[in-house]
């Protein structure tokens, strides 16, 4: 079983990331699902990547963190896939979401990215 190479994220920061996702969903553009998020990261379009921690098997999202590092895309772990699905406007769980157009969440995402850099 693969382990996610993750770092601890304060709950306050994960809540802010989910809030930014909701704002970007309404005023910008997001890519939902691991495949769509992977493509956005590879193309250099991802402004912020949100990854659910509770995905089984972990191999589904194991490549997202290293790929985001390589492409210099900020990424954050969200504890629950249901929360991630709800924030992205889906009625179901979601493993990964990439924000490609921040819309009105641009400043919020920039602030989150700076705080994430300090954590790593």
Swiss-Prot record:
Asked if the Swiss-Prot or TrEMBL record annotates the protein with the keyword Ribosomal protein, the reply is yes
* Keywords carried by this UniProt record: Cytoplasm, Ribonucleoprotein, Ribosomal protein, RNA-binding, rRNA-binding, tRNA processing
Q: What is its main location?
A: cytoplasm
Pfam families listed in its UniProt record: Ribosomal_L7Ae
GO cellular-component term (any): ribosome
Which PROSITE patterns does the record match to this protein? RIBOSOMAL_L7AE
The answer to whether UniProt assigns keyword Ribonucleoprotein to this entry is yes
Its Gene Ontology molecular function terms?
ribonuclease P activity; rRNA binding; structural constituent of ribosome
Q: Where in the cell is it found?
A: Cytoplasm
For the biological process aspect of GO, one term held by this record is:
translation
Family per similarity comment: Belongs to the eukaryotic ribosomal protein eL8 family.
> Which NCBIfam families does the UniProt record give?
eL8_ribo (TIGR03677)
Q: How does it assemble?
A: Part of the 50S ribosomal subunit. Probably part of the RNase P complex.
Mind telling me what this protein is named? Large ribosomal subunit protein eL8
Gene that encodes it: rpl7ae
